[in-house]
């Protein structure tokens, strides 16, 4: 299964005894993931809007073989309703593979 969200925690793991591989990817690779089938669990409304998704606060449970794409916000607290990132902030595209 493929998931797309803005955060990843160990609480998402169905089995805590797995290996995880993560790496920064390009926005082109992130955008390519948006073209296929995926489960949107984007919990932050403004980050979701910035990557072209709707907010969808759901619980997920990932297992071996699943892939999670993230738009990870890095910066000062994002003001509610933001449509652009504040100075010094970035969105980092990441790919997390549960092995």
Cite the ranges covered by each PLM segment.
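Short, surface-exposed beta-strand/loop "edge" segments at domain boundaries and coil↔beta transitions
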Residues: 11-19, 48-49, 75-80, 99
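Acidic, low-complexity, intrinsically disordered interaction modules
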Residues: 36-79
């Amino acid at each position: 299964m493929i998931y797309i969200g803005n955060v990843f925690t160990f609480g998402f793991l169905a089995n805590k005894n797995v290996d995880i591989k993560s790496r920064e990817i390009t926005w082109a690779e992130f955008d390519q993931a948006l073209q296929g089938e995926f489960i949107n669990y984007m919990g932050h409304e403004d980050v979701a809007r910035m990557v072209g998704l709707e907010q969808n606060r759901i619980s997920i449970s990932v297992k071996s073989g699943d892939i999670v794409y993230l738009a990870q916000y890095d910066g000062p607290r994002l003001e509610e309703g933001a449509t652009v990132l504040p100075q010094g902030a970035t969105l980092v595209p990441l790919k997390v593979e549960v092995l």
